[in-house]
Amino acid sequence: KSCCKNTLGRNCYNTCRFIKKPRKTCAGLCGCKIS
């Protein structure tokens, strides 16, 4: 489960995951935490 600060972060994370990037990478890029 990803925890993003806001909707923008979540959208960023989801887009990043959609293009098959690792969760950790996406979380870092988008300012999200992996719980």
Swiss-Prot record:
<dbReference type="GO" id="GO:0001897">
    <property type="term" value="P:symbiont-mediated cytolysis of host cell"/>
</dbReference>
<protein>
    <recommendedName>
        <fullName>Thionin NsW2</fullName>
    </recommendedName>
</protein>
<dbReference type="InterPro" id="IPR036391">
    <property type="entry name" value="Thionin-like_sf"/>
</dbReference>
<keyword id="KW-0929">Antimicrobial</keyword>
<feature type="disulfide bond">
    <location>
        <begin position="4"/>
        <end position="32"/>
    </location>
</feature>
<keyword id="KW-0295">Fungicide</keyword>
<keyword id="KW-0044">Antibiotic</keyword>
<dbReference type="InterPro" id="IPR001010">
    <property type="entry name" value="Thionin"/>
</dbReference>
<dbReference type="GO" id="GO:0090729">
    <property type="term" value="F:toxin activity"/>
</dbReference>
<dbReference type="GO" id="GO:0050830">
    <property type="term" value="P:defense response to Gram-positive bacterium"/>
</dbReference>
<feature type="disulfide bond">
    <location>
        <begin position="16"/>
        <end position="26"/>
    </location>
</feature>
<keyword id="KW-0611">Plant defense</keyword>
<dbReference type="GO" id="GO:0050832">
    <property type="term" value="P:defense response to fungus"/>
</dbReference>
<keyword id="KW-0964">Secreted</keyword>
<keyword id="KW-0204">Cytolysis</keyword>
<comment type="similarity">
    <text>Belongs to the plant thionin (TC 1.C.44) family.</text>
</comment>
<feature type="disulfide bond">
    <location>
        <begin position="12"/>
        <end position="30"/>
    </location>
</feature>
<dbReference type="Pfam" id="PF00321">
    <property type="entry name" value="Thionin"/>
</dbReference>
<keyword id="KW-1015">Disulfide bond</keyword>
<dbReference type="GO" id="GO:0005576">
    <property type="term" value="C:extracellular region"/>
</dbReference>
<keyword id="KW-0800">Toxin</keyword>
<comment type="function">
    <text>Antimicrobial peptide disrupting membranes. Has antibacterial against Gram-positive bacteria S.aureus (MIC=6.5 uM) and B.subtilis (MIC=3.25 uM) but not against Gram-negative bacterium E.coli. Has antifungal activity against C.albicans (MIC=3.25 uM).</text>
</comment>
